[in-house]
């Protein structure tokens, strides 16, 4: 449905999912609704949706697609799957961690031990039991230290275990059963391991009951040393429980989720409490998010906990989430309890999580973020520039000229989106080069259109950018140019002049201006990137002419140098030696031999 054709009657009053798209067909936002007609209609009413991101989203949206489902749960799952498929910029998308810190118990060894592992797969199998993921390797080691105090399992490597002739010092410290020299039975070791597993699952009451039964049984069988070991473990746990009760941690497995939002920034923080210990926090920053708080949280929770081997017993959220089936979607066997306490220890944890999220936002994101309030005053525009491209060029007296642009998106530099253009102008001219780069950048539109273009230059460069965009029929892109004051190109802190639509003649910004400092950082990064690309081009085109042979690219050149160690030796290689190099064709060998003959002729 085209946005200009919208009438409420066109939208069914049914549960479903809607996709908001721009003119190129890119999906900008995906939402779900119990009643699609009511939900979509709010976007078209002035008093319908007060979120500050919505006007900007609607300005870019040209088409809305709807998908009907049977119920709200189906809508929730479909929304999550479509977000993963399309990666819309205005939704929360949790990027997959490459690896996770976990604790693993290998079941392939007769006497298993618990190890800290870093793995992509966080699911248990027949070969190993996985616990986690945890926030860091340090958190894993903290848990291992507690386990070694309470449950005397082996910690040595398999090689050391096999070579042991007598017990190590850990046995003397009552922190290992010494299975390496058969000082315990397999049954006794397995019982201790089972208790450690219960501990990792947070089932402390079951451990206490098992220990009490084990003490009684060992005493009846007159195994007093074994009974003493169980008694010491029980006392350690009981003492810790008393201490933790005062600290209100209660040996539970809990995740507390904090949410902080300001302007276009969203940070979600997960506080991880395992077996009563606060192990740390993980922070997930997002930008350009247009979802409501409840949708942000439910979408995040489904992505974060799906496919994890264990979910905590409780997940605390700052606001109630009205999705009845969500716990069972996270874990069918042992669904976690989702609750939003208003008072007590749970609320204290939630406040702590929110404070952590706020601190992370203020110290990490905002330290490098665009000073939006100052920009809004100067540009007289409420639109937030989500994507900024900064342009620069580099050359050596007009030769080996390159033009580049760098990208600042989602409140961070995005090096994967940086681009380089070899400038083809025969007689180099700054304005002509800039016109060429800008034209080539936008003529194919293979990447997202920026909200703002930043240029290092004065009024002339600013006017050239505006003229080029007009020739390309591109509207809605803010153009900003910054230049040092006339006659001042020293490294000292001086005012700089900013040119934009509201100040085409320029406005002076003092060196203390946060906006100027932000633009200067982007300009410096663009300049660094332009110089590096120029030097690479110069090195390739000018500094190594002797090594240029038709058909011999970088890979084949490396193979030749690996074999012959230097280019001089390559130029002395025989045809038979060249034929032994993998990947060289007959034609390549002919080119190398021709180059050898050419160099010999020139030397003569």
UniProtKB/Swiss-Prot annotation:
Compartmental location: Cytoplasm
Listed GO CC annotations: cytoplasm; excinuclease repair complex
First and last residue of the signal peptide: none
Pfam families xrefs: GIY-YIG, UvrC_RNaseH, UvrC_RNaseH_dom
Family designation: Belongs to the UvrC family.
NCBIfam families per the UniProt record, alphabetical: uvrC
Keyword DNA damage (UniProt): yes
Record's protein name: UvrABC system protein C
GO molecular function: DNA binding; excinuclease ABC activity
Subunit description: Interacts with UvrB in an incision complex.
Organism: Chlamydia abortus (strain DSM 27085 / S26/3) (Chlamydophila abortus)
Annotated keywords: Cytoplasm, DNA damage, DNA excision, DNA repair, Excision nuclease, SOS response
Gene symbol of the encoding locus: uvrC
The protein's role, per its UniProt record: The UvrABC repair system catalyzes the recognition and processing of DNA lesions. UvrC both incises the 5' and 3' sides of the lesion. The N-terminal half is responsible for the 3' incision and the C-terminal half is responsible for the 5' incision.
Residue ranges of domain UVR in the record: 205-240
GO terms for biological process, alphabetical: nucleotide-excision repair; SOS response
């Amino acid at each position: 449905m085209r946005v200009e054709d919208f009438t409420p009657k066109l939208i069914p009053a049914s549960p479903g999912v809607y996709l908001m798209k721009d003119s190129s067909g890119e999906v900008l936002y995906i939402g779900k609704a119990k009643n699609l007609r009511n939900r979509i209609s709010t976007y078209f009413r002035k008093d319908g949706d007060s979120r500050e991101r919505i006007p900007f989203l609607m300005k870019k949206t040209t088409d809305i697609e709807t998908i009907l489902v049977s119920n709200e749960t189906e809508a929730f799952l479909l929304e999550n799957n479509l977000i993963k498929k399309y990666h819309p910029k205005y939704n929360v998308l949790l990027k997959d961690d490459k690896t996770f810190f976990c604790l693993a118990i290998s079941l392939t060894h007769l006497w298993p031990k618990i190890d800290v592992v870093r793995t992509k797969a966080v699911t248990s199998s027949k070969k190993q039991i996985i616990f986690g993921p945890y926030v860091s390797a340090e958190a894993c080691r903290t848990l291992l230290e507690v386990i070694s105090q309470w449950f005397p399992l082996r910690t040595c490597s398999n090689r050391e275990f096999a070579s042991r002739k007598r017990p190590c010092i850990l046995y003397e410290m009552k922190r290992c059963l010494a299975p390496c020299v058969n000082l315990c039975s397999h049954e006794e070791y397995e019982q201790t391991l089972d208790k450690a597993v219960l501990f990792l699952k947070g089932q402390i009451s079951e451990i206490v009951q098992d220990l009490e039964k084990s003490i009684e049984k060992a005493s009846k069988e007159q195994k007093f040393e074994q009974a003493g070991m169980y008694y010491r473990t029980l006392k350690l746990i009981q003492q810790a429980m008393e201490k933790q009760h005062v600290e209100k941690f209660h040996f539970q497995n809990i995740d507390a989720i904090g949410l902080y939002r300001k302007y276009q920034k969203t940070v979600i923080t997960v506080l991880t409490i395992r077996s009563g210990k606060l192990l740390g926090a993980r922070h997930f920053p997002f930008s350009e998010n247009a979802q409501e708080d409840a949708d942000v949280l439910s979408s995040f929770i489904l992505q974060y906990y799906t496919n994890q081997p264990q979910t905590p017993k409780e997940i605390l959220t700052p606001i109630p989430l009205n999705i009845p089936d969500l716990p069972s979607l996270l874990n069918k066997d042992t669904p976690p309890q989702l609750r939003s306490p208003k008072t007590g220890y749970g609320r204290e944890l939630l406040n702590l999580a929110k404070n952590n999220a706020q601190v992370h936002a203020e110290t990490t994101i905002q330290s490098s973020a665009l000073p939006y309030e100052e920009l809004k005053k100067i540009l007289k525009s409420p639109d937030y520039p989500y994507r900024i491209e900064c342009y620069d060029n580099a050359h050596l007296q007009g030769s080996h000229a390159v033009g580049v642009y760098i990208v600042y998106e989602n409140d961070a530099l995005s090096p994967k989106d940086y681009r380089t253009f070899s400038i083809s102008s025969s007689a180099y001219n700054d304005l002509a080069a800039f016109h060429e780069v800008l034209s080539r950048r936008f003529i194919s539109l293979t990447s997202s259109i920026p909200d703002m273009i930043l240029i290092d230059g004065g009024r002339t460069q600013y006017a050239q950018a505006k003229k080029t965009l007009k020739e390309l029929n591109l509207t809605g892109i803010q153009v900003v140019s910054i230049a040092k004051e006339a006659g001042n190109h020293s490294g000292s802190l001086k005012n700089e002049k900013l040119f934009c639509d509201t100040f085409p003649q320029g406005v002076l910004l003092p060196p203390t201006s946060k906006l100027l400092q932000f633009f200067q950082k982007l300009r410096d990064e663009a300049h660094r990137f332009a110089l590096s690309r120029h030097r690479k081009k110069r090195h390739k085109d000018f500094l190594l002419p002797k090594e240029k042979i038709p058909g011999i690219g970088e890979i084949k050149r490396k193979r030749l140098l690996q074999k012959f160690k230097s280019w001089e030796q390559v130029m002395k290689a025989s045809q038979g030696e060249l034929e032994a190099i993998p990947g060289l064709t007959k034609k390549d060998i002919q080119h190398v031999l021709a180059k050898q003959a050419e160099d010999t002729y020139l030397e003569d």
